[in-house]
Amino acid sequence: MNGQRYRETPLDIERLRRLNRATVERYMAMKGAERLQRHSLFVEDGCAGNWTTESGEPLVFRGHESLRRLAEWLERCFPDWEWHNVRIFETEDPNHFWVECDGRGKALVPGYPQGYCENHYIHSFELENGRIKRNREFMNPIQKLRALGIAVPQIKRDGIPT
């Protein structure tokens, strides 16, 4: 472009922010079998995952096929899952949003007794032109253990002021 640098106008930035926010709102509103189409909200090589795992390493699913298979597993294991108390926070970057919310639903994970999960979540969404590039999910892993019927160890907090 003749060495000229493209600069977005404030109006362009606001349009992009609204487009990206609508995608985040759609993602958070999906329930039940509708979640089976959630991968379509991502760029082709987009990724999503849980950043609070027992290994200490994120569990990441990359690309539409991997995200589709994850959605199928989630539909089987958490069939009535829903996000609620959703609060979406915009940042200075129109391509990055944070979400704070609660999640709840039956936990039917193979190898564990049927349970019910309620947890508090933080999501980071990085987007590109209305499509998700990366979604990182953070939650309290202790609540996940309880939902799966796994005994939770007690942490001694001697000396902590109350």
Curated annotation (Swiss-Prot):
Q: Give GO terms for biological process.
A: phenazine biosynthetic process
Which SUPFAM superfamilies is this protein grouped with? NTF2-like
- Key words of the record: Antibiotic biosynthesis
Q: What is this protein called?
A: Phenazine biosynthesis protein PhzA1
Q: Does the keyword Transport apply?
A: no
| Pathway(s) where this gene product acts | Antibiotic biosynthesis; phenazine biosynthesis
Q: What does this protein do?
A: Involved in the biosynthesis of the antibiotic phenazine, a nitrogen-containing heterocyclic molecule. PhzA1 (operon phzA1B1C1E1F1G1) has a role in the biosynthesis of the phenazine during planktonic growth.
Instruction: Give the gene symbol.
Output: phzA1
